[in-house]
């Protein structure tokens, strides 16, 4: 069987529940590996999310949203103000922000962050962490 490659839209429980054996050899990029055997920050996030919501996060978008709020809070702190222009400058100067989904940095003049991407695979109808990479090139949106 040929592998199937997809994007973060594949990051849904439906991939396994609907796909069954047909989901084997699927690989997709997403923002974090949301499993019990993931990183300690992700495990802690899943535990806190479950405590607050009585369910696990459906996919990595919850963790990415958490990182987004944390990144903005960090930028406000570094800016010493919530003035939008100062926060924008602080965001643009972000280097090595340790988010739970990976490290986030911005390059001068580029509004798309350098961030870790997670590649998830399916084998025996189970998700596994295939790779984590930081792309050296990200095309403009």
Give the location of each predicted region.
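Extracytosolic ligand-binding ectodomains
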Residues: 1-141
